[in-house]
Amino acid sequence: MSASADSVESGAVAPELRIEQRRTRTASRALIIAGLALMLLVGFGLRVTQLGAEGLSEDELNKLQAVEDYRAHGLTAANGEHPMLMKALLTASVVAAERWNESSFVAGSPSLRVSTEAALRFPGALFGTFISLLIYLLATEIFGLEVGLIAAALWALDPSGISFNRIAKEDTFLVFFFLLANYFWLRSQRVAESGSGRPEPYYWATAAAFGAMLASKYLPHFFGISVSYYWIFQGIKATRWRLGRRRWLIFFAVMGAAFLICNPTILLPQTWHEMRVFAGEKRIGHDAYEFMGTLYRNQVTLWLKGMPWYFYYVFMGFKLPVPVVLSFLVGLPLLFRERFGDGRFLILFWMLFWFMPFTVMGGKFTRYFTMALPVVLITAAVGVSFMGQWLRLAVARLFDSEALKNYARAVLVLLVLAFPAYASISVAPHYRLYTNVLGGGWERAGSYFPHDEFYDASVRDGVREIVALAPSGARVASETPGLIAHYARLAGRDDLQMLSLSDRKSMAELREGDFIIIARGRRYFSNDALVSQLESEATPVVSVSLGRVPALHVYAVDARELAAVSSRVKGKSDGNE
């Protein structure tokens, strides 16, 4: 009966049914494409709007100087401890912005000029936007369409993700190529296991993406995530997804070629010198990092004696929207359920390879979390999808309405997405300051990770105030003398002399009429006593806020400030360093 019925159905009904199915699939595909396009548009808008609203950080100035060195001398080892790929993209962006600014079109509309800050950050904002698409592709491959769409939307809207993409650092590019590589990797598995085609093109695409990943940031151990995922299937006799020795050799050859194409400066001897100096921790410019009001040594090799192990867990708890945190906690145990498929092991290895080393290492910055954020958001999307299904079943028990069940599920998803959307809009363009209600909201903004939350964003505005006040040849003491000098030079004040606040010898040169800059996030063991005394006893002549949060104070040196500085310098010279 069953076979007969099937044959009758396929003979009599299938033509019309197939036409209707094609229409449905076409409509669904069009809806998905429209949804993804909207996500990309919104995500791009959030990432590029007022991209130059904040001044450069000291780290970003180093990138700008590397760009200038490339333009002046060709390929060099400038900023050589970091790979070249991102710096090449920054160079192209800065050159393009200059040509845009020189065009006749912009000459008639000065408001269309692109600042150096915006040009330097644009590649990260662009690549960060398309990370949403890669998250969608990867999460859909593992967990299905719904999880893929939710995870992509979370990335597009999340204030932390936006903030990471709006700085000129390597982490965004690392994540982009990591996701691209693993999407190709999973596709190669699907093709090999199904026997529906040749997996080799996906192998070589994976290898090329991994080469670009290493040319973005020297963190090769993340390649182990994909290798570990591959390895767990090799003990299963039925597995068809096997590269073999020959294809592995080709894989690494392609990976190496892509790495060299994207990072040719690795062939320069001076680059290896820069990397060796950096790996020896001889480039650490400051002796502490302020975390939750306490100073800690921030050095990788100190391990658990450096930054607290719970640094990134505090970040997750206080810097992500609360519904996202709760959804992550719901989704995490679900990853251990077999019914979620074998692709979940890639997610579990991703967590293992990131959280285990980054929890125990002694040097930490919030931007390192860029690599972990996609896996957190994918897991949160799994939790949202699960809660939506549970809500749908709960509504079904109360109401006999298919429309109501689907409506309830959709409302839950939209409610979760509304929180990061509102959070990002409310803090724009200073996304790093976002702190959720568990962390105290705006009242505690900037108090957990001040170095990363402020990231020298107000230094440019502080210098603008100083150049209007400072007499010729005045000294300016700060923890970022190079950055101060950069903006003073742009303002036509090459006469100003820059001093390091932590250098007692240079601080001894201060005289009345000079200036001291105290920027939040720049408190260290070496300046803590002086900073505390100035903040408690002196009145700043200039105060600069980042949004609604005080960020920087400028003190004019008079007799009282000079006495305070002298006592601190004398105390250090007596052996109290």
Where are the predicted features?
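Transmembrane-helix motifs of polytopic, lipid-linked glycan transferases
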Residues: A118, F122-F143, L180, F184
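Transmembrane-embedded, aromatic-rich helix segments that form part
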Residues: V175-F176, A205, L219-Q234, P323-L329, ...
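Transmembrane-lumen/periplasm boundary regions of multi-pass, lipid-linked membrane glycan transferases
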Residues: E68, H82-M84, A88-L89, G224-G343, ...
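Membrane-interface transmembrane helices that cradle and orient dolichyl/undecaprenyl
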Residues: T140-I142, E146, A181-Y203, M213, ...
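Aromatic/acidic, Gly/Pro-rich catalytic loop(s) in extracytoplasmic/lumenal soluble domains
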Residues: Q497-E577
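Transmembrane-helix signature of polytopic, membrane-embedded enzymes
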Residues: L38-M39, E102-S111, I135-L157, F176, ...
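Short helix- or helix-capping micro-motifs
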Residues: L40-G43, A151-A156, S163, Y183, ...
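Short acidic/glycine- and proline-prone juxtamembrane loop motifs at membrane-interface regions
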Residues: S57-E58, E141, S160, R166-F173
